[in-house]
């Protein structure tokens, strides 16, 4: 970890994918006037937390304990200390909003890693996560 105090927008990989799929559907039906524009599919503002808090959540939901290793050396990389994205346009234009809160996001990610580490069946695990996500089958 370069800087555990930096704040980032954490999201489940299927969240933006669902946004892009909805956008493609709207474009195919000519419901978007100008398709040459940029789109953000961002998590909820509550999902923007410091890296250290994310590590704490991973430790909460992961059966394996995560060891936090901080890189104390000065990085030459310029890095934003507070990274936040806005998906207001997606919300307003195509009625897309993220579904998962941060706890559920981290739990789903930890579940995926735990299952794939045990079964080594990445395809089946990923397919099940996709089905659950689009059927709105969540439990915390």
PLM regions with names:
Residues 16, 20, 41, 51-54, ...:
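Non-catalytic, hydrophobic alpha-helical segments
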Residues 102-140:
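Amphipathic terminal alpha-helices
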Residues 34-39, 49-55, 63-82, 122-130, ...:
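C-terminal "lid/loop" region of Rossmann-like NAD(P)-dependent oxidoreductases
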Residues 14, 25, 45, 105-107, ...:
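Catalytic cores of nucleotide-enabled group-transfer and carboxylate-activating enzymes in metabolic
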Residues 13, 38, 75-97, 118-121:
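Conserved C-terminal active-site "lid" loop/helix of NAD(P)H-dependent oxidoreductases
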Residues 11-39, 60:
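Alpha-helical substrate-binding/gating segment
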Residues 3-15, 43-47:
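Glycine-rich "substrate-gating" loop/helix at the edge of Rossmann-like oxidoreductase active sites
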Residues 23-30, 93, 112-116:
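Generic structural signal for alpha-helix termini and adjacent loop/cap motifs
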């Amino acid at each position: 970890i370069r800087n555990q105090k930096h704040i980032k927008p954490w999201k489940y990989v299927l969240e933006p994918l669902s946004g892009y799929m909805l956008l493609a559907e709207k474009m195919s039906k000519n419901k978007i006037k100008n398709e040459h524009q940029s789109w953000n599919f961002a998590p909820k503002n509550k999902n923007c937390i410091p890296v250290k808090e994310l590590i704490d959540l991973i430790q909460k939901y992961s059966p394996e304990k995560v060891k936090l290793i901080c890189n104390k050396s000065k990085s030459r990389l310029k890095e934003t200390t507070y990274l936040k994205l806005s998906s207001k346009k997606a919300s307003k234009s195509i009625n897309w909003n993220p579904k998962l809160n941060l706890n559920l996001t981290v739990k789903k990610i930890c579940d995926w890693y735990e299952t794939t580490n045990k079964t080594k069946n990445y395809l089946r695990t990923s397919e099940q996560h996709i089905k659950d996500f689009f059927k709105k089958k969540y439990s915390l």
